[in-house]
């Protein structure tokens, strides 16, 4: 349909519609739209229909908005306004690629429209279409050469494309246009200079960067950044004496910064260990109270010199009462010789302080206060916990608690000892004791909630967190709103451990949504940062967003989700009782009766709580409805509700797992787990070439990894057993597998692996699993391989032994209940505190509430009687 042009009166109304939209006066805008469209001549005016649709979209009427905009577009396909509006609609729904197409169509009919070009550039940088972004910024520079955003945007485009020299030239041309007095302090100009210097450094133009820094030093506000950059540049240019002077100046500003000492070392280039130590001895004299110059030499010293320096360092810290001293020295624990020296010294302090209140009986000087002994015992508890001796660690921490029962740090360490020893319930109880000593401390509150979650006590953790969340809303909703991902990852892990897969997946998807929101949140900064000239931070933000899903929170959530989806594929939940059946199948009559009693009590308690919560929920929903509506309008519509039951009964669990896997394959390639999870998914999908690809990538990272060995055997065996593979696929597989396995068969390959790693328990477990996988008649040998607890084995730790017990129980080594019970008893002697190895009759009779209350489950006892 040909475009209809509006007469002056209606044209004036149309301009008022645009103004109303810009000022968010949507109701008024709709009135003016109605005035134009009510005239039969203009009832199908494309641009007015499009603007009406855009206005309705802002009021949350999405379907009607799309219908009107499309109708308007059909009536006027050559209108840049209609295409622009359609692009804005797509952008509001986060359909950025579609929005870019719309903007490009709009520019066909009005190629120099500034607003469309600006909107297009925002989407291009959001989607990292850097070539397109550069072209668009060039057009904007040509149209508005007087605007600084035009120059800066064009320079950033070249910077992101790694054409540093061109970016530096553009910035220099722009800088020349800035009229700034040398004596005037201008923050924005200062940031521009620092950004220009960053570009020069990234271009490798170190001499020019140093000259630039010296020329404009007075006009840069961030003096610390100037000095730090100057030090780096002088090192790059091998002007070592000047660099040393700069780093000495930086040390005076902050004697506690490790990087300045490293920089000074690089500048002075000590020839041997004594010269290196001399650098730090000079710093001791200059900064007698500084801990960093006393700590850093411990990294490279050894023998008597190490002992001498460590002695001085520890005495200073223990006398002052410095709680984090163990964390400061933790990195030294990789060296067994240094660990022995630490133990010798600190045990000696404890003995001497008990007898004569001195660090050494031969010392001359005043006696140490009683708190010094306390901090020595506090350190020793952490030391023995670190080296895997929880009984001795508990002796020291209990002695310390007896002497000072009000010090929170002692309870924190006691909780950690129990956690590392495998008794998370006892750990949670002691962390709760710590929290009860200071209920206003948010750190302790969060720590306690985390431990309670690790004990699978989700309700108690929510109660704990509710002390620091907004009133009037549930703690879980508020924590989700605040993107509190540590809580959600721990929740997901707890739900997974309890076989509540739907709830666990809900938490994983919530975390996934947080990362999507963080990615979308950068949109506002594309204009803000150019306006405020915070260019260094802006470029850092863009680089961070590109690798956002490398974050441990995302990796942990993705790992949990993938593991659950794999379980759901192997054992789909077809009805509500399936999980329950899996838990009760192997129970005795007595255990079953006990479980039923517990369930009845839980049901009764849940009903009472449900009634109490219903009234509270209604109030919360009323409070949140308006906020939720506002949020939905802002983010482009309500999100699909995450329903646990629906998530747990998904039809294509492997496809859902791939959604979590894809970002890991792109961004976390250096972690072997990424490729092994990929193998597990493709193995179930019978995608042989993708299985091979995953194995090869994992092999390149760690060819001796136990889990990788299992994957390789399963791949090898599957290829050998498969008869209906296409010839081309079989040819590729044969060629690549010859490189991986050589001329052998799966059984021989497994035996070779076992011989090569016979002294490693994790490797023995993997080999044992594959012995049974390849030949179920070899079960006895497989169990013997896995259950050996010889003291000479490496990695014979709590985690590995728990994995062996799990393999004995889950069928990986066949049906072997007697072997599992015997192994549990053996491990109980090795790890007496670990819950996983407690005797079958063992029950944790205490339940954790908030603020240290503990009570016996008397009702359960009554029912038993």
From Swiss-Prot:
SMART domains linked to this entry: TPR
Basic and acidic residues: compositionally biased ranges: 579-594, 606-621
Pfam families membership: NatA_aux_su (PF12569), TPR_8 (PF13181)
Motif (Bipartite nuclear localization signal): 612-629
GO biological process, one term: cell differentiation
One GO CC annotation: perinuclear region of cytoplasm
Placement of TPR repeats on the sequence: 46-79, 80-113, 148-184, 224-257, 374-407, 409-441, 485-518, 672-705, 799-834
Induction details: Regulated by NMDA receptor.
GO molecular function, one term: N-acetyltransferase activity
Basic residues composition bias: residue spans: 595-604
Tissues expressed in: Endothelial cells, osteoblasts and myeloid cells of the hematopoietic tissue. Present in adult ovary, bone marrow, brain, heart, kidney, testis and osteoblasts.
Superkingdom field: Eukaryota
Residues modified to Phosphoserine: 302, 537, 588, 854-855
Compartment(s) where it occurs, according to its Swiss-Prot or TrEMBL record: Cytoplasm; Nucleus; Cytoplasm, Perinuclear region
Record function comment: Auxillary subunit of N-terminal acetyltransferase complexes which display alpha (N-terminal) acetyltransferase (NAT) activity. The NAT activity may be important for vascular, hematopoietic and neuronal growth and development. Required to control retinal neovascularization in adult ocular endothelial cells. In complex with XRCC6 and XRCC5 (Ku80), up-regulates transcription from the osteocalcin promoter.
Subunit field text: Component of the N-terminal acetyltransferase A complex (also called the NatA complex) composed of NAA10 and NAA15. Within the complex interacts with NAA10. Component of the N-terminal acetyltransferase A (NatA)/HYPK complex at least composed of NAA10, NAA15 and HYPK, which has N-terminal acetyltransferase activity. In complex with NAA10, interacts with HYPK. Component of the N-terminal acetyltransferase E (NatE) complex at least composed of NAA10, NAA15 and NAA50. Within the complex interacts with NAA10; the interaction is required for binding to NAA50. Interacts with NAAT50.
Protein name: N-alpha-acetyltransferase 15, NatA auxiliary subunit
């Amino acid at each position: 349909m040909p475009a209809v042009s509006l007469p002056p009166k209606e044209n004036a109304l149309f301009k008022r519609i645009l103004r109303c939209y810009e000022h968010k006066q949507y109701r008024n805008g709709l009135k003016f739209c109605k005035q134009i469209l009510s005239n039969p001549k203009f009832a199908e005016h494309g641009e007015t229909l499009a603007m009406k649709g855009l206005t309705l979209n802002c009021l949350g009427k999405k379907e009607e908005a799309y219908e009107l905009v499309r109708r308007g577009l059909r009536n006027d396909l050559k209108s840049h306004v209609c295409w622009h509006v359609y692009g804005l609609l797509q952008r509001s729904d986060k359909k950025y690629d579609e929005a870019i197409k719309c903007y490009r169509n709009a520019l066909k009919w009005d190629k120099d429209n500034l607003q469309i070009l600006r909107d297009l550039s925002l989407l291009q940088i959001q989607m990292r279409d850097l070539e397109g972004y550069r072209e668009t910024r060039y057009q904007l520079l040509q149209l508005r050469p007087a605007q600084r955003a035009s120059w800066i945007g064009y320079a950033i485009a070249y910077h992101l494309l790694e054409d540093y020299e061109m970016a530096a030239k553009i910035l220099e041309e722009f800088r020349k246009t800035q009229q700034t007095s040398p004596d005037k302090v201008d923050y924005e100009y200062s940031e521009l200079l620092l950004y220009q210097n960053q570009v020069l450094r990234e271009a490798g133009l170190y001499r020019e960067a140093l000259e630039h820094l010296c020329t404009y030093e007075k006009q840069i506000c961030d003096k610390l950044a100037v000095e730090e950059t100057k030090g780096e540049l002088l090192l790059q240019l091998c002007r070592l004496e000047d660099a040393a002077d700069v780093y000495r100046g930086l040390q005076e500003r902050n004697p506690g910064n490790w990087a300045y000492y490293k920089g000074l070392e690089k500048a002075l280039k000590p020839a041997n260990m004594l010269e290196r130590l001399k650098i730090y001895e000079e710093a001791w004299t200059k900064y007698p109270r500084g801990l960093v110059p006393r700590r850093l030499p411990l990294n490279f010293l050894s023998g008597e010199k190490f002992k001498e320096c460590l002695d001085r360092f520890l005495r200073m810290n223990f006398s002052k009462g410095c709680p984090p001293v163990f964390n400061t020295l933790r990195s030294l624990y990789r060296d067994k010789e240094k660990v022995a020296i630490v133990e010798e010294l600190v045990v000696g302090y404890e003995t001497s302080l008990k007898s004569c209140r001195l660090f050494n009986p031969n010392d001359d000087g005043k006696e140490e206060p009683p708190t010094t002994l306390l901090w020595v015992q506090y350190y020793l508890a952490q030391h023995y916990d670190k080296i895997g001796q929880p009984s001795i660690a508990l002796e020291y921490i209990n002695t310390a608690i007896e002497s000072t029962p009000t010090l929170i740090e002692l309870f924190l360490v006691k909780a950690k000892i129990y956690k590392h020893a495998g008794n998370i319930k006892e750990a949670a109880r002691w962390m709760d004791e710590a929290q009860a000593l200071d209920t206003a401390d948010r750190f302790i509150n969060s720590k306690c909630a985390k431990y309670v979650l690790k004990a699978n006590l989700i309700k108690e953790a929510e109660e704990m967190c509710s002390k620091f969340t907004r009133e009037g809303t549930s703690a879980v909703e508020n924590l989700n709103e605040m993107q509190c991902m540590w809580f959600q990852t721990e929740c997901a892990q707890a739900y997974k451990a309890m076989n509540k897969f739907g709830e666990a997946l809900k938490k994983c998807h919530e975390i996934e949504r947080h990362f999507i929101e963080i990615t979308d949140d950068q949109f506002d900064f594309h204009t803000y940062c150019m306006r405020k000239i915070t260019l260094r931070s802006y470029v850092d933000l863009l680089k961070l967003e590109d690798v956002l899903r490398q974050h441990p929170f995302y990796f942990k959530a993705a790992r949990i989700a993938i593991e659950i989806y794999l379980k759901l594929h192997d054992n789909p939940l077809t009805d509500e009782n399936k999980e329950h059946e899996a838990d009760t199948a192997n129970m005795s009559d007595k255990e079953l009766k006990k479980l039923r009693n517990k369930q009845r009590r839980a049901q009764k308690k849940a009903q009472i709580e449900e009634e109490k919560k219903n009234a509270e929920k209604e109030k919360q929903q009323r409070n949140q409805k308006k906020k939720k509506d506002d949020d939905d309008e802002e983010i482009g519509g309500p999100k699909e509700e995450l329903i646990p039951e629906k998530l747990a009964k998904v039809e294509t669990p492997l496809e859902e797992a791939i959604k979590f896997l894809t970002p890991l394959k792109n961004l976390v390639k250096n972690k072997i787990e990424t490729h092994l999870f990929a193998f597990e998914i493709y193995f179930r999908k019978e995608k042989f070439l993708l299985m091979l690809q995953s194995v090869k990538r994992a092999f390149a990272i760690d060819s001796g990894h136990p889990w990788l060995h299992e994957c390789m055997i399963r791949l090898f065996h599957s290829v050998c057993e498969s008869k209906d593979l296409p010839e081309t696929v079989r040819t590729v597989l044969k060629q690549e597998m010859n490189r991986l396995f050589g001329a052998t068969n799966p059984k021989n390959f497994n035996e070779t692996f076992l011989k090569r790693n016979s002294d490693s328990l994790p490797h023995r477990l993997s080999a044992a699993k594959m012995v049974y996988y390849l030949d179920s008649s070899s079960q006895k040998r497989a169990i013997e391989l896995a259950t050996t607890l010889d003291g000479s084995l490496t990695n014979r730790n709590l985690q590995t032994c728990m994995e062996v017990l799990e393999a004995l129980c889950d069928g990986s080594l066949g049906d072997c209940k007697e072997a599992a019970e015997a192994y549990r008893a053996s491990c109980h002697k090795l790890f007496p505190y670990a819950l996983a190895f407690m005797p079958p009759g063992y029950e944790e009779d205490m339940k954790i509430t908030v603020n240290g209350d503990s009570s016996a489950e008397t009702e359960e006892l009554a029912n038993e009687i």
